[in-house]
Amino acid sequence: MENEILHSERLLLRRWEESDAEELFKIASDPDVGPRAGWETHRSVEESREVIRRIFSNDATWAIVCKETKLIVGCIGYFTHATSNIPIGESDCEVGYWVAKPFWNQGICTEALRLLLHHCLCVKHFQEIWADHFIGNPASARVLEKCGFRDTGLLNRCSHLLGGDKDMVRVMRLETHGKTF
């Protein structure tokens, strides 16, 4: 697994480590966080450790770390054609992210997503980048719009996500013409 670290003025995106389990549990046990992103709140440090092992330990997922405090504040990554929630092309990816509640409305998701988009376009050379968000999460829609995503008009059900069998997700696509990240 590559150990790429991406960084901006305030943030560091780095690979997850099993030693992050306690920090992950602190932010992923908040009932206001997981369901907005389609997963259940974590119930134990061991569950968080297992999520790091089974889900986050790959070349496409990063911990979002605040440079100033060195605290993990969220998670960001991309999914390829084989693992995407939505039907995308083989040379496309879908991005996803979440941030702990104390860090909402601070521009952290937008800053982290811009880092990831640069990586996806300039390093991984994906052709198109897609995203989706629950209709009931307008803050996520605003993050995507700030980064250049536009509504495709498509709605989707993601029954494997918590709430995805009853709540629709809006599918958005990145408009890359003339954009730099």
Region locations from a protein language model:
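A short helix-loop-beta-strand connector motif used in the catalytic cores of GNAT acetyltransferases and
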Residues: 52-63
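Conserved GNAT-fold acetyl-CoA-binding loop/helix
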Residues: 32-53
